[in-house]
């Protein structure tokens, strides 16, 4: 009931400042219109979950303009069985530091895109270092500054990085995303990687890294990989060597219930029905805790205690639930409030390279 100690004075102040008519209108919107829109508008729900309507101000075709050295822009296309249409997915491939240094002169002198792609593909195919497939969270695109900082961490660790934009994001096909759709996108990029590296007698290890909403997408993929391959691909795929979840949640329903502005409506007697039930259906449920119970892939969870977007308590709850429900490694590394990392800046955490390196070295 503590939120009412804010709500009641707030409306009293509005009444004194704006008068009864305007205050009543605001109250009506607050307690009637907002719940109805939240419950019944699929467009609004999709916007809340994916936030892919936010503009992108960086050049997707030129990774160097975002501060990345030794990177290429490319795309893959496939026929989507989820949306029954052709889908193009935009990607960045960032080379490991050692490979970039070795090829720097050649890359700078190569203007032909096909030749450049051939060089990158060959390096990926014969790689002896890990590959990280990065699944970003909602809003913006693969160009977002905090994402670029993380790619640079991977590059310094001498890993290949593959970063994609799902349908509806960046320069990928502009259609409405759904949980099944973005999971299909991640699967197709993972399949593209495996197609290249599985030609080798000893392919490099592949790890999937998800952040925020990307943890729900990557967990859905890894937890149901065999089923997804059977329904969406014409071949099985091996599991990745590990799954790294940055700022994960248990289910989208619990994330909405614990979101930082949710207390403004939790006092409403119909809160659960109007605000939570829309996120129980398959359209966008992201039941990470259920998906992860189906796989024994090693998992590393990273979460900052001062995260107000996805509260630390949800990451900790996920860790405990998964640890009880399955075998295999499940690790949790928390970052103290004093570090001020919040929801997006674990990429700048002191010692992050060692945390990642230790996990990947242990699970190759």
Predicted segments with their positions:
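An N-terminal hydrophobic leader/cap segment in hydrolases
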Residues: 23-115
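Short beta-strand immediately N-terminal to the catalytic nucleophile in serine-hydrolase-like folds
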Residues: 205-210, 246, 302
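Gly/Ala-rich beta-loop-alpha elbow adjacent to hydrolase catalytic centers
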Residues: 210-214, 218
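Short beta-strand/loop motif that positions the catalytic acidic residue
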Residues: 294-296, 300-303, 307
């Amino acid at each position: 009931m503590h939120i009412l100690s804010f709500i009641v004075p707030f409306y009293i102040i509005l009444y004194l400042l704006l008068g009864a008519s305007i205050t009543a209108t605001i109250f009506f919107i607050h307690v009637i219109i907002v719940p109805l829109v939240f419950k019944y508008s699929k467009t609004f729900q999709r916007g809340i979950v994916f936030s892919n309507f936010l503009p992108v101000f960086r050049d997707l075709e030129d990774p160097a303009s975002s501060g990345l050295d030794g990177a290429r822009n490319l795309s893959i296309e496939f026929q989507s069985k989820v949306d029954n249409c052709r889908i193009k997915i935009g990607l960045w491939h960032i080379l490991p530091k050692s490979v970039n240094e070795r090829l720097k002169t050649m890359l700078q002198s190569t203007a032909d895109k096909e030749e450049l792609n051939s060089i990158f593909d060959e390096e990926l195919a014969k790689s002896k270092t890990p590959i990280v497939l990065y699944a970003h969270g909602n809003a913006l695109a693969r160009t977002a500054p905090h994402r670029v900082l993380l790619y640079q961490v991977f590059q310094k660790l001498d890993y290949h990085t593959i970063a994609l934009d799902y349908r509806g994001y960046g320069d990928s096909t502009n259609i409405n995303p759904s949980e099944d759709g973005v999971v299909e996108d991640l699967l197709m990029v993972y399949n593209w990687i495996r197609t290249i590296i599985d030609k080798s007698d000893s392919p490099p290890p592949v790890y999937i890294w998800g952040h925020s909403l990307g943890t729900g997408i990557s967990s859905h993929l890894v937890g149901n990989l065999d089923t997804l391959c059977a329904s969406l691909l014409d071949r099985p795929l091996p599991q990745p060597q590990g799954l790294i979840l940055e700022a994960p949640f248990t289910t989208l329903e619990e994330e909405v219930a614990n979101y930082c502005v949710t207390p403004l409506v939790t006092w409403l007697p119909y809160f659960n029905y109007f605000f939570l039930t829309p996120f129980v259906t398959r359209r966008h449920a992201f039941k990470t805790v259920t998906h992860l119970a189906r796989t024994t892939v090693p998992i590393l969870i990273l979460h900052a205690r001062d995260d107000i977007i996805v509260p630390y308590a949800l990451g900790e709850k996920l860790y405990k639930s998964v640890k009880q429900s399955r075998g295999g490694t499940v690790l949790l590394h928390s970052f103290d409030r004093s570090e001020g990392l919040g929801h997006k800046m674990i990429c700048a955490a002191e010692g992050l390279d060692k945390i990642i390196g230790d996990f990947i070295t242990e699970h190759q």
